[in-house]
């Protein structure tokens, strides 16, 4: 996988100009419902469920109708079961949920996770625009969660990039504790569930720290009616501890001291991350969520292009 040598001028921050410049490269990133395929080993691949479905009308329930489409409001008023009918929307909504929590402003190699996430989100924003899809999503940090309703056109992509580069969490000066990270991610998933309509494509870009059982529950429900692609970002030091010694790491503007003299401590460190990643990928596979694994030293543009390959029906 290519080292970080893309357009970023800083490994710790992004500019709107840099993200706008990705429009041309994004033209070759495939987002068609039937062709997104993760090439990461062991990943689950499922065909996308298609474009968004827009409510058309309700009619009396008939044998064979999907019980999940029962119109409970009309049913309650008429005292007779009614089912919702949908028509296919011309444009499929694409929602990108980008993680800018304090834990994302970290790297020992390459660029911050937040930089890799922003470049990935920007490329997908432009790819959605080039396909004629409507673009919206969630951009969230430790305490600021912004909802962006889907719209069409170049302005929709520019709006997303503007909110991405102007998000207040780029100025964070501390790292939240585990419980706050968990709450921030949960609130973002809850917000996502409120704005997403059935038949959408959802892209989640995160390191998934604090991915609680409640967050899993909400995301599993979203996966029933939508197609989800998760982009999991980690730093190489999370996979394998450095050689024996004492090291000072910088997360946001905080210093973290780690001691790796003990072999047992090094093994426990590596095994802890492997277990977390294994549980995460197992969850993705169980619910048909496609995924890509990126690191802070990769080129996110090339990773997206190489990981998303055409799949004929």
Residue spans for each PLM region:
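Active-site SXXK
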Residues: 124
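A positional/architectural concept
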Residues: 48-52
């Amino acid at each position: 996988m290519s080292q970080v040598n893309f357009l970023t001028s800083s490994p710790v921050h992004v500019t709107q100009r840099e993200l706008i410049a990705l429009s041309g490269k994004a033209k070759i990133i495939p987002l068609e419902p039937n062709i997104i395929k993760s090439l990461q080993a062991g990943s689950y691949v499922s065909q996308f469920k298609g474009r968004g479905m827009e409510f058309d009308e309700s009619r009396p329930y008939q044998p064979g109708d999907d019980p999940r489409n029962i119109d409970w409001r009309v049913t309650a008023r008429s005292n007779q079961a009614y089912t919702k009918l949908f028509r296919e929307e011309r444009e499929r909504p694409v929602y990108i949920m980008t993680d800018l929590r304090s834990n994302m402003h970290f790297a020992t190699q390459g660029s911050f996770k937040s930089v890799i996430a922003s470049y990935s989100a920007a490329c997908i924003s432009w790819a959605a625009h080039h396909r004629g899809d409507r673009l919206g999503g969630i951009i969230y940090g430790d305490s600021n969660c912004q909802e962006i309703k889907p719209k069409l056109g170049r302005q929709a992509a520019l709006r997303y990039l503007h909110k991405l580069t102007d998000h207040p969490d780029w100025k964070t000066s501390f790292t939240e504790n585990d419980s706050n990270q968990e709450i921030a991610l949960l609130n973002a998933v809850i917000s996502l569930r409120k704005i997403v309509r059935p038949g959408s494509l959802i892209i989640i870009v995160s390191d998934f720290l604090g991915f609680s059982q409640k967050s899993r529950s909400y995301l599993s429900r979203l996966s029933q009616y939508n197609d989800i692609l998760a982009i999991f970002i980690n730093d190489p030091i999370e996979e394998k501890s450095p050689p024996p010694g004492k090291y000072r790491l910088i997360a946001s503007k905080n210093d973290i001291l780690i001691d790796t003299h003990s072999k047992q401590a090094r093994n426990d460190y590596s095994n802890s991350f492997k277990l977390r990643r294994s549980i995460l990928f197992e969850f993705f596979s169980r619910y048909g969520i496609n995924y890509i694994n990126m690191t802070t030293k990769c080129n996110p543009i090339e990773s997206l292009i190489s990981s998303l390959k055409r799949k004929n029906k």
